[in-house]
Amino acid sequence: MHPFERVLSVSTEDIELELRGVKEISWADFWLNPRKLRGSDFLMRWSQGVWAEKRLIDATNKTNQFYAIPYGPSGTAPTNDVRAFELYFERLEADGLGNIKRPDLLVFKIAEKPFVDKFLVSIGGEEELPFITEDKLQELISKAIIAVECENSLWVAAKMPAYNLPMKPQKRLGGKLGLPKVAVLPTVIIKEEDRIPLSRWQQENKIPIHVWHVFFDKAYGLSFDEAQRLVTEGLILPTEQVFQAPDGATTKKAIYKYYYHYAYPLGIATERPQLIPAFIEDKNGHILPYVKFEGDSLDILPEAIKILKQF
């Protein structure tokens, strides 16, 4: 799959759930076709991903104790122009780097900020990071305390139906604690296809990976090692979902949904994002509406800061 399509692939189950959770958003009426038509759903996915990563970077940097930068291509790519975003991934593909999996963010102690900024200037800016092989980035990577894989969901976590429900023994888990398969609650998500490359990246670079999942009102974190343990011990089972790529193709993929009970509280929203109507006009004059997220604020919680200080 082309890297542009992989980044903007949408779980059809997530689309259905997100629509049920945010019925008041009128732009959800626009479900057009993919990459060739610049479908509004995929423009929305692009805007959503930009928002989530920026939100986490801003929240981390606002602590004045840690410094986060985008590292994976979804975060270093242009964020204000979807066509430039696509061309960025075309360039990655042309350079033979399109299928390389990297975490989305690197997080450093604030004392490393001068070094990090100087390093980024020396390579031509953070947007050049995905075009440089990691053997030439070790000086930067080695300074990081963690790497972050970003996920996001269009849900108000505290209003999800199974939020605050305790885990109980489940037959499908062999009597181990869990929740019904159909329970709708905040989860931290990892795709099966990402587990091996993320594990390899963590092992090769000796930097722990955490998954940070952003909701409208909260954010949760889970270490990759803990996620692996939960799967190994049979506490979390894979779920198969159908994903639609921007070219219209659908594929079945296994994902792991980790109950928020297993995660640590990462952040809380102090300001909700505004949903700003936007559109693009294609070369044929076709108008495609979508929504941009603007003007929100997330604070990193003391529990998460305590975890980061351990590194």
Model-derived regions, located:
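Non-catalytic C-terminal interaction segments of nucleic acid-processing enzymes
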Residues: 1-29, 134-136, 162, 166-185, ...
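Interdomain/boundary linker segments immediately adjacent to catalytic/signaling cores
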Residues: 1-101
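Short, solvent-exposed loop/turn segments at secondary-structure junctions
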Residues: 75-77, 153-155, 216-219
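Short, charge-rich binding segments
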Residues: 96-99, 137-141, 202
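Short linear interaction motifs
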Residues: 37-38, 83-89, 124-132, 179-183, ...
